[in-house]
Regions:
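Amphipathic, Lys/Arg-enriched alpha-helical "gate/interface" segment within cytosolic domains
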Residues: 1-157
Length: 157
C-alpha cells in the first residue's frame, strides 16, 4: 500500500490518499503519525480511496482493532473541536470497509464527525468548500506531501 498524507495550508485541509494493497501496519503508522502531530488534527481531512486501493487483506475484526488503536491514541489529546473527515471511494470494492469504519463512534472516541460521500461535489459541500477549493482538491493543487507510508522493499538474499 501507499498512503500519502498531504496538506494545503491555504484552505487548511488535509488530504489522505489510499492506493494499492492496504496493510494493517500502514494504517497503524498513519494513526500514530496523526496522534503525534496534534497541530494537524485541528483541520478537516479528505480521505481519498483510489480505484486501485485493495482492502481485501483487512478484516472487519482488524478494523475493530484499528478503531480501538485510534481511540487509545486520540483520547488523551482531548481535542476541543470536532473535526470533519470525509471519505470518497473511486471504486465500489473498498466501500464495505469504509462503511464499516464509519459505523464506529468517531465523534465520541476521536472528536471527529465523518461522512462517506459519492462525489467530489458532495464531499466539498459537506466540508463547506467553495467551488474553487473543490477544484484544488480534485487536482491536488496546493497540497504538499507531508509523509508517505509504504511497505519496505523486499531485500534480496
Amino acid at each position: 500500500v501507499t498512503v500519502i498524507f498531504r496538506r494545503n495550508e491555504e484552505i487548511e485541509l488535509n488530504l489522505c490518499e489510499f492506493t494499492g494493497a492496504i496493510a494493517l501496519d500502514e494504517l497503524k503508522a498513519v494513526a500514530k503519525y496523526q496522534a503525534d502531530k496534534p497541530d494537524i488534527l485541528g483541520s478537516d481531512t479528505f480521505n481519498l480511496v483510489r480505484a486501485d486501493a485493495d482492502f481485501s487483506a483487512i478484516t472487519f475484526s482488524m478494523l475493530d482493532q484499528m478503531f480501538e488503536h485510534y481511540r487509545r491514541l486520540f483520547m488523551p489529546l482531548r481535542l476541543q473541536i470536532f473535526r470533519r473527515a470525509v471519505w470518497l471511494c473511486e471504486s465500489d470494492a473498498p466501500k464495505a470497509h469504509v462503511a464499516y469504519w464509519l459505523s464506529q463512534d468517531a465523534k465520541e472516541n476521536m472528536s471527529t464527525t465523518v461522512k462517506h460521500c459519492h462525489s467530489f461535489a458532495e464531499a466539498a459541500d459537506w466540508l463547506l468548500l467553495t467551488d474553487a477549493e473543490r477544484g484544488m482538491v480534485e487536482r491536488c493543487e496546493g497540497f504538499v506531501e507531508i509523509i508517505r507510508f509504504q511497505p519496505e522493499p523486499a531485500r534480496g538474499l
